[in-house]
Structures are given as C-alpha cells and as structure tokens.
Amino acid sequence: MEISERVRARLAVLSGHLSEGKQDSPAIERWCTSADTSVAPLGSLKGTLTIVDERTGKNYKVPVSDDGTVKAVDFKKIVTGKEDKGLKLYDPGYLNTAPVRSSISYIDGDEGILRYRGYPIEEMAENSTFLEVAYLLMYGNLPSESQLSDWEFAVSQHSAVPQGVLDIIQSMPHDAHPMGVLVSAMSALSIFHPDANPALRGQDIYDSKQVRDKQIIRIIGKAPTIAAAAYLRMAGRPPVLPSGNLPYADNFLYMLDSLGNRSYKPNPRLARVLDILFILHAEHEMNCSTAAARHLASSGVDVYTAVAGAVGALYGPLHGGANEAVLKMLSEIGTVENIPEFIEGVKNRKRKMSGFGHRVYKNYDPRAKVIKNLADEVFSIVGKDPLIEVAVALEKAALSDDYFVKRKLYPNVDFYSGLIYRAMGFPPEFFTVLFAIPRMAGYLSHWKESLDDPDTKIMRPQQVYTGVWLRHYTPVRERIVTDDSKESDKLGQVATSNASRRRLAGSSV
C-alpha cells in the first residue's frame, strides 16, 4: 500500500526533529501558506503637508502617504542654516511613532476593536483554538484542515526541551521567579540550537523559509514545556515530559498536574478556558515587548535571543504585571461596601485603580468582555472567588461615574484575568508567564514579518542631547569639589554587612 503524501510529510517533520541537522523538513513549507497581503481600503489620506518655518520664512512640503503617515526623515531637511542638523521628532514612549508597517493585527482604541489578520478577536475566541490562531498570525490566513493537522503535529513533535535547558532550570533556586526562569531558558535555547544562529551560520540563514518555520515551531512547542518546568521548580518537583496526544492547552495543564501519571487528563472545560485566554493574549501589535523583539531582531540576532529579550520586557510590572496588581487592589477593597470610599480615593488621587484604562483603548477592551464571560465557566468547576463580586460592583460603579466616563477609563484585559488565573490555582507570580506563552505567537509573527519587510533596518533611535556642551580633562588631584555638586553625581553609600565587618576586622599572615 502506497504511503500518502500527508503521511510522508509527517514523517519528514519527525525526521527533521530527531536529526536536528542542517537540513530542515520540506513538509513545513509545503503545508504552510503565505499571507494574503490585500488590505481593505479605508479611504486614501494621501496628500502633502505644507510647513511654514517661522524661524526662516521658508516653506516645506512633506508627502503624506495613503495611510496618513509622514516619514520622520523628511523633517531633517528643515534647517536654519548650514550648521543645523535638521529637525528631530521628540516622542518619549513612542506615543505617536510608527517604526514599522504591519499586517498582523489591527486596533481601533476609540471603538474598542481588535482584529487578528482582519478577524475580530471575539470571533476567534468563540470559534478557534490557540494553535489555529498562531498559524493565522504567522502565515496570514486560516489553515485548511490538512494544514492545521500538520501544524499541530509539528508543534507537538517539537515540544520536548533539551535536557541541558531543563538542567539549567533545575539548578535555579526554588523561589526563582518563573519569568526569570523563562527568560533564562529561552535564551539558553540559542546555545542548544546553533544551527539557527546568524552569528554562527551567516546572516542569510533566515532567508530560508524552512529554517524560519523550524524555529517558529520549536518556540511555540517548547514555550509551555519551559513554563511548566518553571512552575514545577517552584513546587520542588521535577519537570514532566509533554504528551504527544493532547491539545496545546491540555498538554500544558497535563505537565503541571499529572505528577508523571501518563494516563492523567486535565478537565477539558478548564483547558478550553485557558486556550481562549491564550487566544486573547496572542498578539497586540507594537506593545513594549513586541517592539523589543523587533528592535533586537533588527540587529540580526538569533530568534531565541530576540524572544528572550521580549519576555524580559514583559517581566516589567508596567507591562506584564497588571493583573497581579488588580488582585492586590481588590483584596485591599475587601467588600462591596468599601467601593464608594475607594472610588472617592481614586478621584482624589489618594488611591490607584488597576485594571482600568489602556494606552491604546479609550473604550471597553474587547478582550475584557470575553474574559468576563469566562469567569462563570471557571467558577462553576472550581468554586466562586469572593472577589468577583467586588470586581463586578467596582466596574459598575466606575462606569456609572462621570469621572471615569469622561476620562474614557474602561476595564482592560487584566481586570478579570487575574481572578480567573487565581481560581484555576495559579499563584500570582505565574500570571505573567501565562501571558508570555501565547504572546510567543505575536513575537514570532513580527519577527517573521520583519525578515520580509524591505524597509527593515537596524533600529537606532536619535536622542536630544541635554548635557554639558564641552569641557576638558582635569587631572584627579586638580579637581575641585564644590558644595553645589549635584546629589546625583555622588556615589551612593553601600551599607556594609556585619559579615563584611567581621572579615575586615581579621588579618592575614
């Protein structure tokens, strides 16, 4: 009996995984399609911006593109004289700067819209799976049945983590923060996969779509395994090998809870909730960590280092720690009766409200609506969290108060997610890891897109220099210390421990 082409493809994927050689599986490229780059027209904004420089009286014309953008470099031609280097755009936090063009996700913060490759996030959460969404983000279109099957199979076959990486995780303290573990392990993968490192194999290595796809599948497959190992390390337990017979979220829960029992199967309803949460967190255009990934990738660094850097950015409490802050806030409020006092404290700027407002959304975060509806499903299985009543009442109070409405402060994705994670038994320090696992799909989509973008250049922002203009070196004995020296210029005093004092009190012969 002749082996079908699809079976051959699967065998090729498995062979490529086992060999870890330079030759990559042809099956990946065959079954993965490229994106449809057509974009629905929103109405052309093309034109010309005329600038009158009142310093010189000169007029300048700056082209405006179809999508309403201007090139920052065009402002360099606006000068006052030969010594002038031209205008720079000062934009702290990149509030109105677009360093890339992307077709991966679309956000309209005023209308509360999030779309993955044109698909509304609500539709994807209701109907799709995380791996299908990851494929969509990566390749631009929803997969066919055979493409999805082969994609899921390939990810499953690359879910095992090198023993050396597991040894690194096991060597860390039991109380090591799991995000620190994830950053370290993801970075270590670069060492264990030198075949995919441009610094070792040449800058053109990622010109091969097969090489790219293999790294994508490796990271998507290994991320939950590393995360599970970090979780188990906190509990003092050894890592559990992934199962090859379970869906993505189910497999993650299996590694957390099976205790090595190969017949264990997680609750399918909880696994589905986690899968939906993964979908909601998979991508969110140029957020801090995704921008970090593209920034690093622009240098030509290997994808593992770029992703590790992105996870490091997500580790920051201003980016990935908001749902933990929400839990702390709700716990401090305690009961529904304390909400009016808390609201007044927020309005008087004596208290801080976490989980409301967003850099982009000036409307209800569409992801928050989906997550709110997931809460009852989780509570029906594991029991109701008493803080959910506080959360619902706080949301109602805020959305009926002109102070918050006028400022367009609405619940964001973090407002309810922490309650769900806690109800599912995850400790607060693990919440950001649950954010990082699915966001790998977004990081990798942007990495892949940047490789194909002809406008990609190594990122090297300008600065506005505010320091001393010029001074000359003075020998140390001739320097004068004045009383008005800036406090920031002085070396901070480092406290000496008693152990150091004991050692210094001794002598050596």
UniProtKB/Swiss-Prot annotation:
Peroxisomal citrate synthase required for the fatty acid respiration in seedlings, citrate being exported from peroxisomes into mitochondria during respiration of triacylglycerol (TAG). Indeed, complete respiration requires the transfer of carbon in the form of citrate from the peroxisome to the mitochondria. Pfam families: Citrate_synt. It is found in: Peroxisome. Disulfide bonds: none annotated. It catalyses: oxaloacetate + acetyl-CoA + H2O = citrate + CoA + H(+). Gene3D superfamilies: Citrate Synthase, domain 1, Cytochrome P450-Terp, domain 2. Widely expressed. Expressed throughout the shoot. Expressed in flower, silique, stem, cauline leaf, young leaf, mature leaf and senescent leaf. Pathway: Carbohydrate metabolism; tricarboxylic acid cycle; isocitrate from oxaloacetate: step 1/2. Coiled coil: none annotated. Keywords: Peroxisome, Transferase, Transit peptide, Tricarboxylic acid cycle. Residues 500-509 have a biased composition (Basic residues). The keyword Transferase applies. InterPro entries: Citrate_synth-like_lrg_a-sub, Citrate_synth-like_sm_a-sub, Citrate_synthase, Citrate_synthase_AS, Citrate_synthase_sf. The active site is at residues 319, 358, 414. GO terms for biological process: fatty acid beta-oxidation; tricarboxylic acid cycle. GO terms for cellular component: cytosol; peroxisome. Residues 485-509 are annotated as: Disordered. This is Citrate synthase 3, peroxisomal. The keyword Repeat does not apply. CDD domains: AthCS_per_like. GO terms for molecular function: citrate (Si)-synthase activity. Citrate synthase is found in nearly all cells capable of oxidative metabolism.
